[in-house]
């Protein structure tokens, strides 16, 4: 079966939120190991609610923001948010995820190629995506590189207990 892309609809919310939580739980476990529980809870205590709030505002009324879902065998298995900056002509691949049980099937590639094509149609002359430099984000970095992202500005987030 082929992965199909379509616009996000309100009835996709619960499934997309579950994909988001399932896909990002390993990242947050690593964050907690790295930061320690005390700082992790200060920074990320409500990470699931933050995703729920963000996704609950989709589809966005802002024409610069589009959200699409990936369907495989009739099931929503991924999603991608794109943001077009008409001023800079730079498009962004924003929040996105593939359900863990559907990863490594080419769905991410399909989503990113779709997103890049859509951004180009909307006037983008360049595109960017942000991801973590930690080991939990290594698959995401590989996926972005596989669709042609080839320049990166490293960034670090430092924390300390006060």
Q: Which functions belong to the PLM regions below?
A:
Residues 34-38, 145, 162:
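Residue-level signal for alpha-helical context at structural boundaries
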Residues 90, 126-128:
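Structural preference for beta-strand elements that scaffold enzyme active sites
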Residues 3, 7-14, 18-94, 99, ...:
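Acetyl-CoA-dependent GNAT
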Residues 103, 128-140, 159-162:
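Conserved beta-strand-loop-alpha-helix junction that forms the acyl-donor binding cleft
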Residues 109, 121, 125, 133-154:
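Conserved active-site alpha-helix within GNAT-family acetyltransferase domains
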Residues 98, 104-117, 142, 146:
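Conserved acetyl-CoA-binding loop-helix of GNAT-fold acetyltransferases
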Residues 116-119, 162:
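Generic leucine side-chain signal with a strong bias for well-ordered alpha-helical environments
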